[in-house]
Amino acid sequence: MTDLTAAARLALSLMDLTTLNDDDTDEKVTKLCHQAKSPEGNTAAICIYPRFIPLARKVLREQGTPEIRIATVTNFPHGNDDLDIALAETNAALAYGADEVDVVFPYRALMAGNEQIGFDIVKACKDACAKAGALLKVIIETGELKDPALIRKASEISIKAGADFIKTSTGKVPVNATLESAELMLQVIHDMGVGKEVGFKPAGGVRTAEEAAQYLALANRIMGDNWVDARHFRFGASSLLGNLLATLGHGEQKSSSGY
């Protein structure tokens, strides 16, 4: 097995296979569930809008993969600074049955100098998720923050407020995951000494096995060789799956979007 096939197999098992499009339908979400059960094993999770969770739960159960986790998004994709709305959306997502909630950090408020609202929103959503036994991932939108100091600050605030994962991007802005932002975020996890509790998720723009391998190598370098697993590392992606399967000898499979 080459290093690339090993990385491809690992990356597949760490994927949050995603469809977050305005034209999503029951049919598209059902297809996504089928894709998550791949010939090389299951993805870690699927990531879909909250209203599709009951359907996805049923499809995953019927196809014999109830262990595939269901993630969803809240305060998405805008990252507004209204705590009541962010919390209400998170509670609704949990009521639908989400295993994991990816909430967007109020990054524009942080850029304007308000650190407190980010902490408050993450903490409120974390408390709700903890009660429901769900994981909370916090999307800091690195491609909009841009400034390394702000990327670090958003990561630190999210972790202090209880984030289970910090995630780069919504996939809805021009610049999504980059190795540079990944390095900054992983370094914060390392420097705060929270590697046991906090994971990392690059999202958007990771489209090939080669790119995935670069992120895995970066995580190994910063966090150590045994850190990467589904509790500590995810890829938020859709088009990546087809490339991983092609790398593993299954031919090119098209996915539902370019995320």
From Swiss-Prot:
<feature type="active site" description="Proton donor/acceptor">
    <location>
        <position position="201"/>
    </location>
</feature>
<feature type="active site" description="Schiff-base intermediate with acetaldehyde">
    <location>
        <position position="167"/>
    </location>
</feature>
<feature type="active site" description="Proton donor/acceptor">
    <location>
        <position position="102"/>
    </location>
</feature>
<comment type="function">
    <text>Catalyzes a reversible aldol reaction between acetaldehyde and D-glyceraldehyde 3-phosphate to generate 2-deoxy-D-ribose 5-phosphate.</text>
</comment>
<dbReference type="InterPro" id="IPR002915">
    <property type="entry name" value="DeoC/FbaB/LacD_aldolase"/>
</dbReference>
<keyword id="KW-0963">Cytoplasm</keyword>
<keyword id="KW-0704">Schiff base</keyword>
<dbReference type="GO" id="GO:0005737">
    <property type="term" value="C:cytoplasm"/>
</dbReference>
<dbReference type="InterPro" id="IPR013785">
    <property type="entry name" value="Aldolase_TIM"/>
</dbReference>
<dbReference type="GO" id="GO:0009264">
    <property type="term" value="P:deoxyribonucleotide catabolic process"/>
</dbReference>
<keyword id="KW-0456">Lyase</keyword>
<comment type="pathway">
    <text>Carbohydrate degradation; 2-deoxy-D-ribose 1-phosphate degradation; D-glyceraldehyde 3-phosphate and acetaldehyde from 2-deoxy-alpha-D-ribose 1-phosphate: step 2/2.</text>
</comment>
<dbReference type="InterPro" id="IPR023649">
    <property type="entry name" value="DeoC_typeII"/>
</dbReference>
<dbReference type="Pfam" id="PF01791">
    <property type="entry name" value="DeoC"/>
</dbReference>
<dbReference type="GO" id="GO:0004139">
    <property type="term" value="F:deoxyribose-phosphate aldolase activity"/>
</dbReference>
<protein>
    <recommendedName>
        <fullName>Deoxyribose-phosphate aldolase</fullName>
        <ecNumber>4.1.2.4</ecNumber>
    </recommendedName>
</protein>
<comment type="similarity">
    <text>Belongs to the DeoC/FbaB aldolase family. DeoC type 2 subfamily.</text>
</comment>
<dbReference type="InterPro" id="IPR011343">
    <property type="entry name" value="DeoC"/>
</dbReference>
<dbReference type="GO" id="GO:0016052">
    <property type="term" value="P:carbohydrate catabolic process"/>
</dbReference>
<dbReference type="GO" id="GO:0006018">
    <property type="term" value="P:2-deoxyribose 1-phosphate catabolic process"/>
</dbReference>
